[in-house]
Amino acid sequence: MKYLIAGLGNIGKEYEKTRHNAGFEILDTFAKASNIAFITKRYGDIAEVKYKGRTFILLKPSTYMNLSGNAVNYWLQAEHIPQDKLLVVLDDLALPSGTVRIKGKGSDGGHNGLKHINQILGNSNYARLRFGIGNDFPQGYQMEYVLAKWTKTEYESLIPHFETAVETVKSFALAGIEKTMNTYNRKN
């Protein structure tokens, strides 16, 4: 069974290890732990991970955050993956740093990547894993905050949380959304 795991972020060296690229970091953690490299293909970087009878197509869109729907839709079609096997991994300002939350569907929560995916797919009926990046910034500085790089200390402290997010992704495919929500939404 195939699953499309779309990690949201922005391409380019200047965006590496920024808070807004938490989705990319989580997919990088998954691929690295599986000894799999990403390959540049249409609309993004792709890695295919096989785990316990499941195939995970990891997608890091090259469309920039605000046009993520184009890449997600293309790869759903190209791999013949139904929307209920889609999991979008993204950063979330509303959650404390390192917190992992998964749910089966919902609003875009003001996230431009989700807004575009909803627009292109025509609905919001897909799972999403939100990774908390906190909101420790002065009023009016949200953009600067999300596009800022984590400090070395912050990043190192988040590595176990990236690993928890990867375990949550695996559970989504192995145990289903409900059991995964019950297990991982309570952990942190």
How would you label these PLM feature ranges?
Residues 1-104, 115-129, 136-141, 148, ...:
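Nucleotide and nucleotide-moiety/phosphate-recognizing core
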Residues 110-113:
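Hydrophobic alpha-helical segments within soluble ligand-binding/sensing domains
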